[in-house]
Regions:
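PLP-dependent class I/II
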Residues: 1-287
Length: 287
């Protein structure tokens, strides 16, 4: 969905902006269109988009902005205030450069939000938005690549974008998911898996990490948490964690230095068993 959406709104030589940290596959998706991915530097520790830098980086060649909320790897949910200002910047820059800048919103974790909060819809803030969604997260169907692209009414080219993406899918060799999965998911539009387990797991990890002195932003959704590593080299920190049977992902993968991603899309008992290992890992850096 993301690859098709980007291809539909860009031409070779165009620029696509995204915010660090970001899902690493964005790079190949954009490169495959002949466009260039430019990455807005992160704004730690909150990891809300760095809108001051964003405003400065938008140029005449910018035709698309790619966002991900709730965010992988941080778990951060972009606030309504953030989305309002982002929309204002996009509107202003579109007028200045004489062409609309599209917003592609990657939202596979939309249903996984904590504290009873609702995730703001980026499309509600900016008209030229294409929304990408996947059922693999909310229905716990990892590996089943089934989702959609929704073009907001009023978006430039709304009459042709959907047809364009259907043809892009054919020409790039992307096949439809098996029909039995499509039919099954079609009957599950109003349900999700038990997503409360993710919030339980998040609270266990967040409480333990903060108690151990890690610098970490509390996730607002997803099933990831993104603490700062206890040394500058995140790769070295991940190798150290393996000595305690902890498998972490270094933040270099996501365009940021010095952090690690922990995934907690596992049963709660396994999360509980990991807590003593985190204690041992932290203790190893206090020696």
């Amino acid at each position: 969905a993301i690859a098709h959406a980007i291809r539909a709104v860009t031409q070779p030589g165009d620029e696509v902006l995204t915010f660090a940290p970001y899902f690493p596959e964005y790079g190949p998706y954009v490169a495959g269109t002949g466009a260039v991915l430019r990455v807005v530097p992160p704004q730690a520790p909150t990891f809300q988009p760095n809108l001051d830098a964003f405003e400065q980086m938008i140029g005449e060649k910018t035709t698309c902005v790619l966002i991900n909320t709730p965010n992988n790897p941080t778990g951060v949910v972009y606030s309504a205030q953030t989305l309002t200002r982002m929309a204002d910047i996009l509107t202003e820059k579109s007028k200045a450069f004489g062409h609309n800048i599209f917003l592609v919103s990657d939202e596979p974790y939309r249903d996984i939000a904590f504290d009873g909060k609702k995730v703001p819809y980026p499309a509600a803030f900016y008209p030229h938005t294409l929304t990408c969604f996947s059922y693999s997260k909310s229905l716990s169907l990892p590996g089943e690549r089934l989702g959609y692209v929704a073009v907001r009414p009023g978006c430039e080219g709304e009459d042709i974008l959907v047809d364009m993406m259907a043809q892009i899918s054919r020409f790039t060799g992307h096949n439809c998911p098996p029909s039995i999965i499509q039919r099954a998911v079609g009957r599950c539009q109003e349900v999700t898996s038990d997503l409360s387990v993710y919030e339980t797991n998040m609270n266990l990890l967040y409480d333990k990490l903060t108690a151990l002195g890690f610098e970490v932003e509390r996730p607002g959704g997803t099933f990831y948490i993104f603490p700062k590593a206890l040394e500058e080299d995140a790769n070295a920190f991940c190798l150290k964690a393996r000595e305690f049977d902890l498998l972490l992902v270094p933040s270099d993968t996501f365009g940021v230095k010095g952090y690690v991603r922990l995934a907690y899309c596992i049963d709660t008992e396994k999360v509980k068993r990991s807590l003593p290992a985190l204690e041992k890992l932290a203790a190893a850096y206090r020696k």
